[in-house]
Amino acid sequence: MTSPALVLRGVVKRFGNHIAVDGVSFEIPRGIVYGILGPNGAGKTTTLRMINDIIAPDAGEITILDGLKPGETAATHIGYLPEERGLYPKMRVIDVIEFFGELRGLKRAEAKKRAGSWLDRLGLGKWAKNKVQDLSKGMQQKVQFATALIQEPELVILDEPWSGLDPINAEVLRDVVDEIRKSGRTVLFSTHQMEQAEKVCDAVCIIARGKKVLDGRLRELKRAFAAEGLVALAFADDAARAKSDPILADPALVAEKRAARAHDHADCEVKLAHDTTPPKLLAALVGQGVAITRFEVVVPSLHQIFVDKVGEEAAVAERLEPGR
């Protein structure tokens, strides 16, 4: 059986009296895209730094690929894009990518070949001989992305990779991440952008205040939350809406009625009572002649799951500024 790409068991990191990472455990199979999500200060970046041996855990165990521990040997199998970008501003773009390739063990000719290929892949070919400082922030970020991938690592670790990218370049990055997955390699990243995570992740781990809140395959998590019975409703007119009121007020059918989410174009959402199913509620409405234009079991977005598990206040903060 193939060993996982990464395993964390009870990992703890303290800074003085502050516990930044508190007993976090998760396991990442090979060949998937895995996202670490959480509010600001949750411990995302600290976790990635421990995996990369930039800082050491105070307790717990980290195992990389075939039983490797964080350190020099494991580093040869890892490509890392840190949150704090760092390139040599006065070097030519192609030279800096070649340089990082050679640092990771490539022969000069191979490093030069791969650097050129990555520049073309990322739409930077015409900038190859420009100095890094001549590039925009987003373009520099793509250059650093290339430096993390030039040796074709088995495990790619990206800290806030979409920060600062416009929609076009964000799409390019998503495409590259998908190519890495299709090649059988593994991608681990942190992000505060739930919409990006939902587009690329196979599995996620949500952490808050240093503790793991939940983890698992994204599809399974969404299915589990959908099973809690949230239904979006829209009615043909005010008369139908009024006719539905006593049915939606029946505690045997509906546990909670709430306003529809913004831009959802529903009249309301209802959370079903414990022993109720969507067909049972639909039958009750139709049986009373309620004219319905929409009856939809809500499959939650990743953002909605995040809000449910972490809280609206933290989720709003996460949308407003990059997380760590």
Spans of features found by a protein language model:
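C-terminal coupling/interaction segments
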Residues: 273-324
